[in-house]
Amino acid sequence: MKAKLALSIIGLVLASLVAGCIGGGTQTQTQTQGKSIKVAILFDVGGRGDLSFNDMAYLGAERAKKELGVKIEYMTPKSKEDMVPLLEQLAKSKEYDLLVLVGFLWTTPLNEVADKYPDQKFALIDSTTGKVRPNEVDILFREQEVAALMGVIASGMAYELGGDTIGAVAGMDIPPLWKFHIGYLFGAKYFEKKTGKHVKLLWQYTGTFGDTQVGYNTAMQLLQQGAKVLYGLAGLTHVGMFDAVKDWNEQGRGKALAMGQDASQEWYAPKYIPISGAKRVDVAVYDAIKMVVDGTWKGGIITLGLKENGVGYWDLDGVKQFAEFAKEAGKLKDMTPDEVVEIVKQQREKYIKPYVWEIVNELAEKIKNGEIVFKTPKSHDEYEQIINELEKGNLNAALKKGSVE
């Protein structure tokens, strides 16, 4: 299947995101270059099947295999304790031109291994070791930017559902999730400031990215506390959140909606998931591989946000493409991709009103133009301080540059 994925606000994005990573030449020439390149994709402990982060990485690698002709192998450690031995084993083998490490949990293992094998190239996706090495590329995302937009959208939908409370089912208490938390709360308070409508956020860490039952139970608790919209930030775990929202509605316990993240997840329950945030893990993986194929590899840290088309939210073209992918994989059984799109379109029109889109677009422009730049907390204490200030309505506490009056 073609990975023709679309982002709202930013438009259709299939080209590379990382400046300088894409070299010239025809696809045939690139495929010839890539035939001798061997890459290992190392998922985090959640592995494939999360319909989100790891599956997006898989899509990027499969695109590289098809377009660049590289050989790809996939591996998932059984536990965090297995990560260093696995990484050491692969680096020592000298069998792979590139080891792509998917997710924050690989940060410490990479720091332990990278200097021992200076000739082995590593790409760390969604984290950084904090060290600049010639054999290491770290690709980060400015999660605050997508989460801020989703916070505005969630707040607007909550009011359409007759409430003022939004929630989030998050995975582990780690830096990428800190940024999501800051952005989501910022978006809610930005909505509050623009409309005068109070918004309450219920944020819950589950401690796992791979347990749907935990996601279900956590979501039910948040719904019982009054949350009208839940944002899934826990990989496979938040698939359980989707099930909880579906049951909540269909059992007549109240009205609630869910929002996905990373991949377009609307197809899973389009009546109850009108929108998903986008985090282009797929393109980050693809571009890391292409740097090796093209011979343009340069160690360092790359950060992607709205301006670089690295984050956003999925438009209806993206919804359809992922619904088609789900259909081909046998996961979408009860409707066609076109039916998914039609339901999502109707739900967006019903629950995301024009005034909300105006606020979203205004905020997105400020972010893309650099008028607003979010802080990235360097410690858990700083993260907590920012959250505490945001809860008081001090939006500027989250900003490195710019202000909200």
Curated annotation (Swiss-Prot):
One Pfam family of this chain: Bmp
Protein name: Uncharacterized lipoprotein PH1714
Signal sequence residues: 1-20
Keywords linked to the UniProt accession: Acetylation, Cell membrane, Lipoprotein, Membrane, Signal
Membrane disposition: Lipid-anchor
Location of the protein in the cell: Cell membrane
Residue numbers bearing the N-acetylcysteine modification: 21
Organism, as annotated: Pyrococcus horikoshii (strain ATCC 700860 / DSM 12428 / JCM 9974 / NBRC 100139 / OT-3)
Entry's Gene Ontology cellular component terms: plasma membrane
Top-rank lineage group of the source organism: Archaea
Lipid tethering residues (S-archaeol cysteine): 21
Positions of disulphide bridges: none
Family matches, as Gene3D superfamilies: 3.40.50.2300
SUPFAM superfamilies found in the cross-reference section: Periplasmic binding protein-like I (SSF53822)
Protein family membership: Belongs to the BMP lipoprotein family.
